[in-house]
């Protein structure tokens, strides 16, 4: 008798498939990574696995939101309201040094029903990570975990 409700364990340990399936099944929602560690090839692999699960993958350029009416109309809000499983890659994360934008992102990711969304903030460097996610006064303080970069 198998009491394990999860299916990700049918994939071999250390594989990208097990990792992505596990993130969805375990409800792990917000990640960060670095452009020099998670390049286009690895992102494409993660996108292919997500697509195989019926999950759409999109890229949102956070710099494109600066100065826009992002609070009332944005691709992020469309994704949240659609309830369609989606993996979002946030790029140009330096925009999150703007506390207003960062606070709004934190707010929508924590107050709306976002169980159908997984987000990855693609950062340029460790300093950017420290300023956005490790500064106690920053809106996104300690709100992510490192995206695992399985080398399968």
Model-derived features: where do they sit?
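Extended, compositionally biased accessory segments flanking or bridging domains
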Residues: 1-85
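A short helix-turn-beta junction within AAA+ P-loop NTPase domains corresponding to the substrate/partner-engaging
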Residues: 131-152
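Catalytic-core regions built around general acid/base machinery
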Residues: 104-112, 135-139
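Short, well-ordered coil/turn elements that cap or connect secondary structure elements
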Residues: 52, 114, 139-142
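Hydrophobic/aromatic beta-strand patches that form the interior of the parallel beta-sheet core
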Residues: 29-32, 58-60, 120, 141-147
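A short acidic, amphipathic alpha-helical/loop segment
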Residues: 44-45, 100-108
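Conserved P-loop NTPase "ATPase switch" module shared by AAA+ and STAND
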Residues: 61-68, 72-104, 118-126
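Short, charged/polar "capping" segments at the starts of alpha-helices
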Residues: 37-44, 98-99, 127-131
């Amino acid at each position: 008798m198998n009491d394990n409700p999860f299916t990700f364990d049918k994939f071999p340990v250390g594989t990208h498939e097990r990792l992505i399936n596990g993130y969805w099944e375990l409800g792990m929602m917000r990640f960060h990574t670095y452009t020099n560690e998670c390049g286009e090839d690895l992102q494409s692999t993660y996108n292919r696995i997500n697509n195989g699960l019926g999950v759409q993958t999109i890229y949102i350029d956070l710099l494109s939101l600066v100065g826009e009416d992002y609070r009332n109309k944005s691709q992020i809000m469309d994704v949240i309201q659609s309830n369609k499983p989606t993996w979002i890659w946030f790029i140009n994360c330096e925009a999150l040094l703007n506390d207003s934008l960062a606070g709004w992102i934190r707010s929508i990711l924590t107050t709306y029903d976002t169980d159908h969304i997984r987000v990855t903030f693609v950062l340029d460097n460790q300093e950017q990570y420290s300023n956005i996610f490790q500064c106690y006064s920053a809106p996104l303080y300690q709100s992510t975990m490192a995206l695992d970069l399985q080398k399968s």
